[in-house]
């Protein structure tokens, strides 16, 4: 019985010692992040699209801060993001890069081919917003109002019955920018 307690104490002391060493090393050898990179990364839209030529927003922010990369290459962010970065870095705003056009991608929604769905629930487990409804061995359905089009449910599906399809724009789904609609105000006295 004493041998068990000695072994437990020895393993506990080893764990405590290694924990203390790791804690010290994490503080002693900590790498400081560049605050300018952090601020640029916060401004970028975080779409991780790669249209700027970098694999994501963070590498593009590092290239802007450290390597002097152009600030006008973010297509999803467009002119608004470029102006914020120019203000942050105190540089002249630049026109959008010819290749980087401000695009508003069509909203995509997952669609399940219910004839091929085997009800495995792998897509339900993968969906981060719980937009898929169904049960084991029962066909599943996507609630299009909740679906963000993130594409995370497509790969886990063993029968490949899930696809992303663009949502048709209707007057109900259109995002109206009321500031750009010309409005003429008619004085009240002319209404009678």
From Swiss-Prot:
<feature type="binding site">
    <location>
        <position position="123"/>
    </location>
    <ligand>
        <name>[4Fe-4S] cluster 2</name>
    </ligand>
</feature>
<feature type="binding site">
    <location>
        <position position="117"/>
    </location>
    <ligand>
        <name>[4Fe-4S] cluster 2</name>
    </ligand>
</feature>
<dbReference type="InterPro" id="IPR017896">
    <property type="entry name" value="4Fe4S_Fe-S-bd"/>
</dbReference>
<feature type="binding site">
    <location>
        <position position="49"/>
    </location>
    <ligand>
        <name>[4Fe-4S] cluster 1</name>
    </ligand>
</feature>
<dbReference type="InterPro" id="IPR010207">
    <property type="entry name" value="Elect_transpt_cplx_RnfB/RsxB"/>
</dbReference>
<keyword id="KW-1003">Cell membrane</keyword>
<feature type="binding site">
    <location>
        <position position="127"/>
    </location>
    <ligand>
        <name>[4Fe-4S] cluster 3</name>
    </ligand>
</feature>
<dbReference type="InterPro" id="IPR007202">
    <property type="entry name" value="4Fe-4S_dom"/>
</dbReference>
<dbReference type="GO" id="GO:0005886">
    <property type="term" value="C:plasma membrane"/>
</dbReference>
<dbReference type="GO" id="GO:0051539">
    <property type="term" value="F:4 iron, 4 sulfur cluster binding"/>
</dbReference>
<feature type="domain" description="4Fe-4S ferredoxin-type 2">
    <location>
        <begin position="138"/>
        <end position="167"/>
    </location>
</feature>
<keyword id="KW-0411">Iron-sulfur</keyword>
<keyword id="KW-0997">Cell inner membrane</keyword>
<keyword id="KW-1278">Translocase</keyword>
<feature type="binding site">
    <location>
        <position position="157"/>
    </location>
    <ligand>
        <name>[4Fe-4S] cluster 2</name>
    </ligand>
</feature>
<comment type="similarity">
    <text>Belongs to the 4Fe4S bacterial-type ferredoxin family. RnfB subfamily.</text>
</comment>
<dbReference type="GO" id="GO:0022900">
    <property type="term" value="P:electron transport chain"/>
</dbReference>
<feature type="binding site">
    <location>
        <position position="150"/>
    </location>
    <ligand>
        <name>[4Fe-4S] cluster 3</name>
    </ligand>
</feature>
<feature type="binding site">
    <location>
        <position position="153"/>
    </location>
    <ligand>
        <name>[4Fe-4S] cluster 3</name>
    </ligand>
</feature>
<dbReference type="InterPro" id="IPR016463">
    <property type="entry name" value="RnfB/RsxB_Proteobac"/>
</dbReference>
<feature type="binding site">
    <location>
        <position position="52"/>
    </location>
    <ligand>
        <name>[4Fe-4S] cluster 1</name>
    </ligand>
</feature>
<dbReference type="Pfam" id="PF04060">
    <property type="entry name" value="FeS"/>
</dbReference>
<feature type="domain" description="4Fe-4S">
    <location>
        <begin position="32"/>
        <end position="91"/>
    </location>
</feature>
<feature type="binding site">
    <location>
        <position position="57"/>
    </location>
    <ligand>
        <name>[4Fe-4S] cluster 1</name>
    </ligand>
</feature>
<keyword id="KW-0479">Metal-binding</keyword>
<keyword id="KW-0249">Electron transport</keyword>
<feature type="region of interest" description="Hydrophobic">
    <location>
        <begin position="1"/>
        <end position="26"/>
    </location>
</feature>
<comment type="function">
    <text>Part of a membrane-bound complex that couples electron transfer with translocation of ions across the membrane. Required to maintain the reduced state of SoxR.</text>
</comment>
<keyword id="KW-0004">4Fe-4S</keyword>
<dbReference type="InterPro" id="IPR050395">
    <property type="entry name" value="4Fe4S_Ferredoxin_RnfB"/>
</dbReference>
<feature type="binding site">
    <location>
        <position position="147"/>
    </location>
    <ligand>
        <name>[4Fe-4S] cluster 3</name>
    </ligand>
</feature>
<dbReference type="Pfam" id="PF14697">
    <property type="entry name" value="Fer4_21"/>
</dbReference>
<dbReference type="InterPro" id="IPR017900">
    <property type="entry name" value="4Fe4S_Fe_S_CS"/>
</dbReference>
<keyword id="KW-0677">Repeat</keyword>
<protein>
    <recommendedName>
        <fullName>Ion-translocating oxidoreductase complex subunit B</fullName>
        <ecNumber>7.-.-.-</ecNumber>
    </recommendedName>
</protein>
<dbReference type="GO" id="GO:0009055">
    <property type="term" value="F:electron transfer activity"/>
</dbReference>
<feature type="binding site">
    <location>
        <position position="74"/>
    </location>
    <ligand>
        <name>[4Fe-4S] cluster 1</name>
    </ligand>
</feature>
<keyword id="KW-0408">Iron</keyword>
<keyword id="KW-0472">Membrane</keyword>
<keyword id="KW-0813">Transport</keyword>
<feature type="binding site">
    <location>
        <position position="120"/>
    </location>
    <ligand>
        <name>[4Fe-4S] cluster 2</name>
    </ligand>
</feature>
<feature type="domain" description="4Fe-4S ferredoxin-type 1">
    <location>
        <begin position="108"/>
        <end position="137"/>
    </location>
</feature>
């Amino acid at each position: 019985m004493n041998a068990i307690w000695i072994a437990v104490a020895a393993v506990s002391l080893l764990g405590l010692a290694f924990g203390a060493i790791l804690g010290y090393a994490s503080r002693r050898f900590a790498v400081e992040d560049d605050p300018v990179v952090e601020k640029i990364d916060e401004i970028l839209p975080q779409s991780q699209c790669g249209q700027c030529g970098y694999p994501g927003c963070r590498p593009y922010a590092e290239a802007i801060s450290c390597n002097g990369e152009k600030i006008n290459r973010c297509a999803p962010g467009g002119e608004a993001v470029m102006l914020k970065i120019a203000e942050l870095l105190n540089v002249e705003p630049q026109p959008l890069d010819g290749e980087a056009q401000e695009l508003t991608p069509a909203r995509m929604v997952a669609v399940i081919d219910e004839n091929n769905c085997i009800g495995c629930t792998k897509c339900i487990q993968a969906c981060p917003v719980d937009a898929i409804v169904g049960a084991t061995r029962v066909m599943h359905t996507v609630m299009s109002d909740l679906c963000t089009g993130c594409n995370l449910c497509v790969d886990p599906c063993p029968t490949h019955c899930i696809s992303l399809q663009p949502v048709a724009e209707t007057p109900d789904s259109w995002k109206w920018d009321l500031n750009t609609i010309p409005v003429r105000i008619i004085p009240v006295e002319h209404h009678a």
